[in-house]
Structure formats: structure tokens, C-alpha cells
């Protein structure tokens, strides 16, 4: 099922993380896709890295094989964040997203657990 964690400081939510199966169907039950959101004020302070550690640790205990990220090609800091945590770019899907009035590529990244 869907897993969810919250990072807080001084009783305020500063970030959250979740993961769920990459695609429907039993054939994908060992591949998860995650989302991590950290408040701008707390970026580059280790919050995202800590949340990712929790996500991947939890998934690994459940015998999950891989954690996936779908990142907008425009979001270079997020791509670098994932690369710093051993995610590898495995595909780039051209113009599948729409942001800021234009179509954008989706970068698929994977970490083997």
C-alpha cells in the first residue's frame, strides 16, 4: 500500500515523503515510485536526504527491488539530488509533462535497493 512520512520542526511540517507501486498489477510489486517535498526554507539542510533514507530503508525491509523517481528535466537540482543518492538516469521521455506553459521532458531515475 501507499506509505507516507512527515518531517517536522517546532510542530511545523517542513517536508513529506511517500512511495507506492510504480505501476498497477502484481508484475510491478517490487518497484516503487517516490515523492519527496521539502519546504524551500529547509532545502539543502539534509531533510530530503533523511526522508529518502527512511523511504529506501522501509522499502528494502519489504524486499522492494528498486525505487524510482520521475523528475521534470527542468528541475536540475532534483536530478542532482537523486544522483547524489545513487539514483541513475535510465530514460528521458520527451514532452510528456506540461509546466509553465510548455511541454517538458520527464527524466526517469532508478536506485537499486
Residue ranges of predicted features:
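Conserved beta-strand-loop-alpha-helix junction that forms the acyl-donor binding cleft
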Residues: 43, 69-79, 96
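Short secondary-structure boundary/hinge segments and terminal tails
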Residues: 29, 60, 77, 100-101
Amino acid at each position: 500500500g501507499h506509505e507516507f512520512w512527515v518531517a517536522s520542526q517546532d510542530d511545523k511540517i517542513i517536508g513529506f515523503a511517500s512511495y507506492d507501486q510504480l505501476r498497477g498489477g502484481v508484475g510491478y510489486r517490487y518497484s516503487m515510485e517516490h515523492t519527496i517535498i521539502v519546504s524551500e526554507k529547509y532545502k539543502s539542510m539534509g531533510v530530503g536526504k533523511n526522508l529518502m533514507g527512511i523511504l529506501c530503508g522501509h522499502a528494502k525491509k519489504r524486499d522492494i527491488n528498486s525505487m524510482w523517481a520521475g523528475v521534470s528535466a527542468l528541475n536540475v537540482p532534483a536530478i542532482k539530488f537523486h544522483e547524489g543518492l545513487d539514483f541513475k538516469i535510465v530514460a528521458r521521455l520527451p514532452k510528456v509533462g506540461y509546466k509553465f506553459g510548455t511541454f517538458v521532458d520527464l527524466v526517469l531515475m532508478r536506485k537499486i535497493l
